[in-house]
């Protein structure tokens, strides 16, 4: 019986590692320039994702009268290679979202149901006010890190 539990636990861990690695591959494919020959490490991928998210935040916080893309941000311009298809969730990202997720501009949640059921095999957390990341980690400031 203990052997069966260990085998099942190992299988769950293999699946989890595979899912994490797949997530990094998807993120890397979205962010890494096509002409870049060396594959980014996980740390590099996360670092570049943070930069990209920060640049998107700047774009979202801009005055609507200003141009939407600045020439001072050459790393991630809003071109077709890094376009997130008008914020639509791609099928490749669906495994990382709540099961009942739907963008606000495409569908409404029936009868005001805002419960979140996450696809994680080990997750039993349900909350409508915090993301899983916010529930697990304190807010982080990246201002102390050097920009490369």
From Swiss-Prot:
Locate the compositionally biased regions of type Polar residues: 63-78
| Keyword Transcription regulation belongs to the record | yes
* Region listing for Basic motif, in residue ranges: 4-17
Coarse class of the protein's main subcellular location: nucleus
Its localization reads: Nucleus
The segment annotated Disordered runs over: 1-21, 63-83, 112-132
Please give an example of a GO cellular component term from this record: nucleus
What is the reported phenotype of gene knockout? RNAi-mediated knockdown disrupts differentiation of ASE L/R sensory neurons.
Q: Which GO terms describe its biological process?
A: body morphogenesis; egg-laying behavior; locomotion; nematode larval development; neuroblast fate specification; neuron differentiation; neuron migration; positive regulation of growth rate
Boundaries of each bHLH domain copy?
Answer: 4-56
GO terms (molecular function) for this protein are: DNA-binding transcription factor activity, RNA polymerase II-specific; protein dimerization activity; RNA polymerase II transcription regulatory region sequence-specific DNA binding; sequence-specific DNA binding
Q: Which UniProt keywords apply?
A: Developmental protein, DNA-binding, Neurogenesis, Nucleus, Transcription, Transcription regulation
Q: Which domain of life, per UniProt?
A: Eukaryota
Q: Where is this region: Helix-loop-helix motif?
A: 18-56
Q: Where is the composition biased (Low complexity)?
A: 120-132
> Is the keyword DNA-binding in the record?
yes
Query: What does the function comment of this entry state?
Result: Probable transcription factor, involved in determining neuroblast cell fate, morphogenesis and aspects of terminal differentiation in both left/right symmetric and asymmetric neuronal lineages.
Listed name of the protein:
Helix-loop-helix protein 14
Q: Which organism is it from?
A: Caenorhabditis elegans
Give the classification, highest ranks: Eukaryota, Metazoa, Ecdysozoa, Nematoda, Chromadorea
Q: Which gene encodes it?
A: hlh-14
């Amino acid at each position: 019986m203990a052997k069966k539990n260990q085998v099942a636990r190992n299988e769950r861990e293999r699946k989890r590692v595979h899912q994490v690695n797949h997530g990094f591959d998807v993120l890397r494919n979205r962010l890494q320039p096509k002409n870049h020959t060396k594959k980014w490490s996980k740390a590099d991928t996360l670092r570049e994702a943070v930069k990209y998210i920060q640049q998107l935040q700047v774009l979202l916080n801009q005055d609507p009268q200003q141009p939407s893309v600045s020439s001072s941000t050459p790393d991630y311009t809003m071109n077709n290679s890094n376009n997130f298809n008008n914020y639509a969730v791609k099928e490749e990202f669906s495994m990382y979202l709540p099961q009942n997720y739907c963008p606000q501009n495409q569908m409404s949640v029936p009868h005001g149901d805002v419960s979140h059921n996450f696809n994680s095999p080990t997750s039993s957390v349900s909350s409508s006010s915090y993301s899983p990341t916010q529930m697990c980690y304190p807010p982080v400031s990246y201002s102390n890190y050097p920009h490369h």
